[in-house]
């Protein structure tokens, strides 16, 4: 049986941990990986928080060596800020950077982020 591949990342199973705000922190992801998750994803991280060097936001990027492969999820609506955030995540050790375009939470959507960003074609222009 062949397990899924995402880009150049070969997974070792089918179980994936979804990003959950306030839940999928470092400790939770390590436990999920030990329990069989083939890929873990951290809770969504604000691109603006990374841009402004917010310490609490940067703490959300911590990755344990034993949890690879790991995906970090980014949300925002400014392409330049999103690009910077993706670079910060890559430098932090993310195997995959996931762009959140589905969160319906009002506090996210009111800023044009999450599911509100789906209509922004300038954000989708560089999808791969």
PLM regions with names:
Residues 17:
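An anion-binding catalytic pocket shared by soluble metabolic enzymes
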Residues 121-128:
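Conserved small/polar residues in nucleotide/adenosyl-binding loops
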Residues 12-13, 37:
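Conserved catalytic motifs of the protein kinase core domain
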Residues 2-5, 20-95:
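Glycine-rich, positively charged N-terminal anion/phosphate-binding segment
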Residues 44, 49-50, 101-118:
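Glycine-rich, proline-tolerant flexible connector loops at the mouths of alpha/beta enzymes
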Residues 12, 67-69, 112:
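Short, solvent-exposed beta-strand edge segments and adjacent coil->beta transition regions
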């Amino acid at each position: 049986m062949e397990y899924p591949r995402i880009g150049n990342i070969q997974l070792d199973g089918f179980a994936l941990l979804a990003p959950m705000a306030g839940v999928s922190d470092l400790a939770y992801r390590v436990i999920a990986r030990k329990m069989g998750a083939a890929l873990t994803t951290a809770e969504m991280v604000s691109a603006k928080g990374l841009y402004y060097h917010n310490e609490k936001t940067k703490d959300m990027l911590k990755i344990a060596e034993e949890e690879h492969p790991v995906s970090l999820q980014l949300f925002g609506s400014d392409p330049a800020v999103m690009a910077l955030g993706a670079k910060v995540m890559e430098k932090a050790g993310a195997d995959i950077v996931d762009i959140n375009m589905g969160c319906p939470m009002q506090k996210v959507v009111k800023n044009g982020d999450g599911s509100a960003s789906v209509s922004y074609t300038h954000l989708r222009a560089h999808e791969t």
